[in-house]
């Protein structure tokens, strides 16, 4: 019997309406003589500028999205009808999670499927309760004596939810020489579970480091002819990026399509996952329309032609940072800030002169609207748009929560612009910083700290003085995901930047500081990413100074960094894969299935 239609809104073709012409290839930065004529009117300023002078250009790819179509589309308002259906399905799944008679491994696999399918946020307290019962009843000790799969799965789930479990759980699967037993490689499911568990390691956990090497070496030896198409897809998916570092929505859509192929799939769980995915997608569409209207109203993309117009990519990034449906304010805030960051980064990196950049930095530090009188005309529009947007965000927070957050927002922007300015000085002076000097500035110029400051005030309901103090200091909760953001970004762009002779990049600075090859420097940067993840894992286990929703948001920023920069710079140069991902998360619903 066919199930009810779970598609809440019409699917949008990959090549129809939403896209403009295909994107051209990236062209290397070249100097040009630009005659710029801008005529801009806002409520507070109007100007006309004509200037002819040498300016650099990065020849960025143009925006490939049709904003008019986005603004004209309308989400199916019948979403309310589906909420009742979702509640009934949710109740059935909740009963399964809370079934105290369920076998340990059955329970663990159910929890794993719930989370992979994007439903974890619906069952947080139920999952925590089930894991509490699992531990208190001796479940962890029991599964470690029976199978590697059960041991690895329970280890990963427990660490993910803040339980302290020892890596020694894997000692029973090693021989007398301390090596993992060779016969384990015959159990592909167990090796996959071991691989995923190894990414929850802390600093100094050598057993898990060895487990990762062991699992990767055996998984890479497998072929589709040997293990079958379905299992090969799972292996390739895992090797591309481990589950712990994947963004939630992309993993959900992949897992739903993989799960529906299973003969023993839980149909109630699958139906809820599809319904939930499409319902949340309709929320994203509403959010995107709101943000798109703001972007059109601001008008920077049409006036500053030298800069990247990346609103859709910025919104997609924001979904990765805060995917839960209740965090619309966070998504809109982060998307707006990343759109500004992208354009202002191009001003500092490409277009502005050093004198102009110092003026702009001073204007942001002063946060005085009269500072626009000291700026060149193209900067006036940008500063005033930034000034009005941030003041509006601060006003809304004061109105809704009674907190004046403007000083914290403006400080974050001043810090970012100063970091941008330092990079511009290195470029203009043609100097190569040491790796430590570069990275001490670069993790801030990634914009990670700024985005997380804005995210904090959007997701945290009860703002605490201690949290504010640590927010301003860019506590480890903020700095470490920003480190990963910068390192992932630099890995994606290093080869191209080195070829152009640019010096300020993690890889190039590491090469010069250590006197090593690009290959070795790249490997070292990847190791830094792994070590940073171990520190973040430790903080999550040990408890954070910040509220849990913000901690998860910060970790998600690191995950989105992997997603965006894993196969190149998908923010600067979005390719076909990036566009497909954006569509799958934001516009294309998952079609219903047949029972």
UniProtKB/Swiss-Prot annotation:
Mg(2+) 3 binds at residues 489, 493, 497. Residues 1-37 form a transit peptide. Optimum temperature is 40 degrees Celsius. The keyword Isomerase does not apply. It comes from the Eukaryota. A motif (DDXXD motif) lies at residues 345-349. Belongs to the terpene synthase family. Tpsb subfamily. This is Isoprene synthase, chloroplastic.
């Amino acid at each position: 019997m066919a199930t009810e239609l779970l598609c809440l809104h019409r699917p949008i073709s990959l090549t129809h309406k939403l896209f403009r012409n295909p994107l051209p290839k990236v062209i290397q930065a070249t100097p040009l003589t630009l005659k710029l004529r801008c005529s801009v009117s806002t409520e507070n300023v109007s100007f006309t500028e004509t200037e002819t002078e040498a300016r650099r250009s990065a020849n960025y790819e143009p925006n490939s999205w049709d904003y008019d179509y986005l603004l004209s589309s309308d989400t199916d308002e019948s979403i309310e009808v589906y909420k009742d259906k979702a509640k009934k399905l949710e109740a059935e799944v909740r009963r399964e999670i809370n079934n105290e008679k369920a076998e340990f491994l059955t329970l663990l696999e159910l929890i794993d499927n719930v989370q992979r399918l994007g439903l974890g946020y619906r069952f947080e307290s139920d999952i925590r309760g089930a894991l509490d019962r699992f531990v208190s009843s001796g479940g962890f000790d029991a599964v470690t004596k029976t199978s590697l799969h059960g041991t690895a799965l329970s280890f990963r789930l427990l660490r993910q939810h803040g339980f302290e479990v020892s890596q020694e759980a894997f000692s029973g699967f090693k021989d007398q020489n301390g090596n993992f037993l060779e016969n384990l490689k015959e159990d592909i499911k167990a090796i996959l579970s071991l691989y995923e568990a190894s990414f929850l390691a802390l600093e100094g956990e050598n057993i898990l480091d060895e487990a990762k090497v062991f699992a990767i070496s055996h998984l890479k030896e497998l072929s589709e002819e040997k293990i079958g198409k379905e299992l090969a897809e799972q292996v390739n998916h895992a090797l591309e990026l481990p589950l712990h570092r994947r963004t939630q929505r992309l993993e959900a859509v992949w897992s739903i399509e993989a799960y529906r192929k299973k003969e023993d799939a839980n149909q109630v769980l699958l139906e809820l996952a599809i319904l939930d995915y499409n319902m949340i997608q309709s929320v994203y569409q509403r959010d995107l329309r709101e943000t798109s209207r703001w972007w059109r109203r601001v008008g920077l993309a049409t006036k500053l032609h030298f800069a990247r117009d990346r609103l859709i990519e910025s919104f997609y990034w924001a979904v990765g940072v805060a995917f839960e449906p209740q965090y619309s304010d966070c998504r809109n805030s982060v998307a707006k800030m990343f759109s500004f960051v992208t354009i202002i980064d191009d001003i500092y990196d490409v277009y502005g002169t050093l004198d102009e950049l110092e003026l702009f930095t001073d204007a942001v530090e002063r946060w005085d609207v009269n500072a626009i009188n000291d700026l060149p005309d193209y900067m006036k529009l940008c500063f005033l748009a930034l000034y009005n947007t941030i003041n509006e965000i601060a006003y809304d927070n004061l109105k809704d929560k009674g907190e004046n957050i403007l000083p914290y927002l403006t400080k974050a922007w001043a810090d970012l612009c100063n970091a941008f300015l330092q990079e511009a000085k290195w470029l203009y002076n043609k100097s190569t910083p040491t790796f430590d000097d570069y990275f001490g500035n670069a993790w801030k110029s990634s914009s990670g700290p700024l985005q997380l400051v804005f995210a904090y005030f959007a997701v945290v309901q009860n703002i605490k003085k201690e949290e504010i103090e640590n927010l301003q200091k860019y506590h480890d909760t903020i700095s470490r995901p920003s480190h990963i953001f910068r390192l992932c970004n630099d890995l994606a762009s290093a080869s191209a930047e080195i070829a152009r002779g640019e010096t300020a990049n993690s890889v190039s600075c590491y090469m010069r500081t250590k006197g090593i090859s690009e290959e070795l420097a790249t490997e070292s940067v990847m190791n830094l990413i792994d070590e940073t993840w171990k520190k973040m894992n430790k903080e999550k286990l040990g408890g954070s100074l910040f509220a849990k929703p913000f901690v998860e948001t910060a970790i998600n920023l690191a995950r989105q960094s992997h997603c965006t920069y894993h196969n190149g710079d998908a923010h600067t140069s979005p390719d076909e894969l990036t566009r497909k991902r954006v569509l799958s998360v934001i516009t294309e619903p998952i079609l219903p299935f047949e029972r």
